[in-house]
Amino acid sequence: ENVDYCESLAAKEYFSYYHEGFNRRSEDPINSRLNYGYAVVRSAIARKLVATGFHPTFGIHHDNQLNAFNLADDLIEPYRAIVDLVAHNNIASNIQLTKSERRELAHVLHNACIGDGVKVNVMSAIDIMVESLKRIILDASTEKLKLPMILPIESMEGITE
């Protein structure tokens, strides 16, 4: 069965729970928040990939020649849920995000999750995941990729912005 087709069917089903008639490409306040939050996490993953020596264009599953971030798109999936949780807080009625909303969504990188069995922020979980991918590839390891476990929305202590 075509993996892309399965992924698109799953996404369609998932997004149908947002509200009736929701389309992930529609222009509405929820979608604006989701897109911004996903972009924040995607760019953090891409930065870590480059810093670790990966070329983010070369993906494992994603392989669009016009996409410079295929590998980041492969790795973002487990982080979408945390963006979804944050994006559904205080939804405004305007498509255009305010500075405050953008700050709140960028703060997703400081939310708590479990990375390698320890409570860490999303940025640290991204570091753990990418470093584990590097070890798997370089050592031809059978180790599993260290993915985050999502927690309810909670900011790590000591981070105010």
Regions found by a protein language model. Give the residues of each.
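Active-site helix-to-loop segments that bind/position phosphate- or nucleotide-bearing substrates
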Residues: 1-161
